Every structure is written in structure tokens, then in C-alpha cells.
């Protein structure tokens, strides 16, 4: 199975609803972390920020689920509505070398306002 060499970390601000996407080429420090764990934002250039992992997706595009333990793919029953459910493949709640995207939300803000960081990322992107 091919392994992910670059991991995209999506940082969302719950106050403004805005998000930035940061790529890290050395994601080994993330391995073993689970959905719900907090990580230090200084490792991705967000000094003073604390981020909570809320989800992600693996190299094949399967979403991570908090209920599925470990770094594995499983088929689970997914409720579509009250009367119908389907089997869906999902990835477990632990980050491994097969994860390509990690979704996070800010739980503690740093000294630099997120609005300023957001504007810097937008101007660098263009």
C-alpha cells in the first residue's frame, strides 16, 4: 500500500468559520494521535495555538470515524434515514502513515489573531 508523504492539516476557526490548509512533509509527529486529541500548533507554524483533531481521510479517500478503534479500514452500517442503512467503508480513529488529510479546530488561540494568519495564507496562495 502506498504511504502518504505529505499530510494536509486543515485548521478551522469556530468563531469566524474560516479555514486554512497547511501541508507538512514530515507528519511522523502526528502518528498515533486519535480523533479528539489536542496537538500543538507551533509544529505547523501556529505559535501559541492548540488544535483538536476532529477527523480526516486516508489515502483512498475513506473518512475517519471516532467509533472505529485503530488505524484500520472497516465496513460499518451507516444510517441513511430511520428505515434505511447501508454498508460503508471507513478508516479508524488513529492517525497513521495512510492518512493524507487531518481536520482540526482551534481550541486555544495564540497571540497572533487568526484573521491575520488567514489573510497571510490567502495572499500567499494567489
UniProtKB/Swiss-Prot annotation:
Signal peptide: none
Domain of life: Archaea
Keyword terms, alphabetized: Ribonucleoprotein, Ribosomal protein
GO molecular function, one term: structural constituent of ribosome
Gene Ontology terms: cellular component: ribonucleoprotein complex; ribosome
SMART domains: Ribosomal_S6e (SM01405)
Keyword Transferase in record: no
One GO-annotated biological process of the protein: translation
Protein family according to the UniProt entry: Belongs to the eukaryotic ribosomal protein eS6 family.
Protein name: Small ribosomal subunit protein eS6
Species of provenance: Nanoarchaeum equitans (strain Kin4-M)
Gene name linked to the record: rps6e
